[in-house]
């Protein structure tokens, strides 16, 4: 054990001194928010309790063998314990989502009083501990009743129902909520759910990779994406007309943003990378900032890409007070077919239209991501230059590790340090970034990997009916950073080990 301790201390020293610039919490503005995140289906559990009805995520997860969110971290019953952990950590903000089918079980109409009570209690508990709630209205979990009735996000009826749902949330919770995200990672939501079939409700054209029972990959992602933008804009308009002057909050949309870098120095790969940015970033950002889709997308996708009316264009333009960024890693982009590509560019859908090949960096794979903080810095610089430097929140950033592998998650610490440093560098270069959220606060059910990997700073024992929480080393590091007791690039990190019991084990 002594040999292990010395080896670990050496690794921590190496980790703590591997960055050129020291930074602390005080290196960031006082109003910059450091937080952590979860989502309703992934954290709450209690899927059949107190009036909640099934969502499309319940249906989707029960169709596969990667587990489900029936109990998961049991946040519904353990939220007070988790809020205390956040307060001890010094967390400044907690991002969570509201389960539409818990609050309004039929998707529209009567409010579930027990669902309303749960979210009011959670929000007030956060506020009483000085933690700012950042509330996401939609995170992959459409009430199954609306999917069954009219097809959900591929039907324009969703705009009215989503706006009515948002109205309930603004009215009931808005006095205590200053940050709202309408729809989570809109780009990858439309692609994963309506092209690739890898996210609920699992639509895609027939292919050899995923067995979808319905869908059209060449049209549905664009229809869903269009309705996402219109639903967001409608909810945003409602908030600004009815609530903003009194509640004084902000409302935004989030996108999933891979870092994108040319695979070679060739002109072809540079052009391919710009094309990928146009499709993966510009698809949502250009309408939000300028009121219409990128010309290259309109030319390529043609009549399959819906058209904004003049009124819709004006409503979408400027509808986001901020842009939320979901980012985990970076991929190389090439114009020429490589031996291994992450996403198939041939097929019927989005990636065929994009017409480039995406290659993992280093040892990255679909579920294991290499730390590439320069990729996030590049995204923030690109958004600054291309989209009028809007306010940005990094709403998810974290590192997956094999579940139950270790509490000494030094790789995760290194990852978080590097990405916070990248955010600081981008801000020094003028990016209007205003917050950073680690995914995830505690171990949760993951959308792609179920319970095989975990991102949490707190380990959750999913075999224990009580879902015991145990801090990982990353929780201790984040606590030290937020409380000003760790100066990155100094050797203060060594103190973590002396405070983190050698006997701490799973």
From Swiss-Prot:
Transmembrane segments: none annotated. It comes from the Eukaryota. Its EC number is 3.2.1.21. Glycans are attached at residues 211, 216, 363, 429, 461, 483, 499. Disulfide bonds join 204-212. Keywords: Disulfide bond, Glycoprotein, Glycosidase, Hydrolase, Signal. SUPFAM superfamilies: (Trans)glycosidases. It catalyses: Hydrolysis of terminal, non-reducing beta-D-glucosyl residues with release of beta-D-glucose. GO terms for molecular function: beta-glucosidase activity. One of its GO terms (cellular component) is peroxisome. A beta-D-glucoside binds at residues 42, 139, 184-185, 328, 396, 439, 455. GO terms for biological process: carbohydrate metabolic process. InterPro entries: Glyco_hydro_1, Glyco_hydro_1_N_CS, Glycoside_hydrolase_SF. It holds the Pfam family Glyco_hydro_1. Residues 1-22 form the signal peptide. Belongs to the glycosyl hydrolase 1 family. This is Beta-glucosidase 9. It comes from Arabidopsis thaliana (Mouse-ear cress). The gene is BGLU9.
């Amino acid at each position: 054990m002594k040999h292990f301790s010395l080896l670990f201390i050496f690794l921590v020293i190496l980790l703590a001194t591997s960055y050129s610039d020291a930074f602390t919490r005080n290196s960031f503005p006082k109003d910059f928010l450091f937080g952590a995140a979860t989502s309703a289906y992934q954290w709450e559990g209690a899927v059949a309790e107190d009036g909640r009805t099934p969502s499309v995520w319940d249906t989707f997860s029960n169709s596969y063998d990667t587990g489900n969110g029936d109990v998961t971290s049991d946040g519904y019953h353990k939220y007070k314990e988790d809020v205390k952990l956040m307060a001890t950590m010094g967390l400044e903000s907690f991002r969570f989502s509201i389960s539409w089918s818990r609050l309004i079980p039929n998707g529209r109409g009567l409010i579930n009083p027990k669902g309303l009570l749960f979210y009011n209690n959670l929000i007030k508990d956060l506020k009483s501990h000085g933690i700012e709630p950042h509330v996401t209205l939609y995170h992959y979990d459409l009430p199954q009743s609306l999917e069954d009735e009219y097809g959900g996000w591929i039907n324009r009826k969703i705009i009215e129902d989503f706006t009515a749902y948002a109205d309930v949330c603004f009215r009931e919770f808005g006095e205590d909520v200053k940050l709202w995200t309408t729809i989570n990672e809109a780009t990858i939501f439309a692609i994963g759910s309506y092209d690739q079939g890898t996210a609920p409700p699992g639509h895609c054209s027939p292919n050899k990779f995923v067995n979808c029972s319905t869908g059209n990959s060449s049209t549905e992602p664009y229809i869903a994406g269009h309705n996402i933008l219109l639903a967001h804009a409608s909810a945003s308009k409602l908030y600004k007309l009815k609530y903003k002057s009194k509640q004084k909050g902000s409302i935004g949309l989030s996108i999933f943003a891979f870092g994108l870098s040319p695979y070679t120095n060739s002109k072809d790969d540079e052009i391919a990378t710009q094309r990928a940015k146009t499709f993966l970033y510009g698809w949502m950002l250009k309408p939000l900032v300028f009121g219409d889709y990128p010309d290259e997308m309109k030319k390529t996708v043609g009549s399959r890409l819906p058209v904004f009316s003049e009124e819709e264009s004006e409503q979408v333009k400027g509808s986001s007070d901020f842009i939320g960024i979901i980012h985990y890693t970076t991929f190389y982009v090439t114009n020429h077919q490589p031996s291994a590509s992450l996403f198939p560019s041939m097929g019927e859908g989005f990636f065929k239209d994009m017409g480039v090949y995406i290659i993992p960096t280093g040892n990255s794979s679909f579920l294991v991501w290499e730390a590439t903080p320069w990729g996030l810095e590049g995204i923030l610089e690109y958004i600054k230059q291309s989209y009028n430097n809007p306010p940005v929140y990094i709403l998810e950033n974290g590192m997956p590790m094999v579940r139950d592998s270790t509490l000494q998650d030094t790789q995760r610490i290194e990852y978080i340090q590097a990405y916070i440093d990248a955010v600081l560098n981008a801000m020094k270069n003028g990016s209007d970034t205003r917050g950073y959220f680690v995914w995830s606060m505690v171990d949760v059910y993951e959308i792609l990997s179920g319970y095989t990997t975990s991102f949490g700073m707190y380990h959750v024992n999913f075999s224990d009916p009580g879902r015991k929480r145990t801090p990982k080393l990353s929780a201790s590091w984040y606590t030290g950073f937020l409380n000003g007791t760790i100066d990155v690039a100094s050797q203060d990190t060594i103190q973590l080990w002396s405070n983190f019991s050698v006997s701490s084990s799973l």
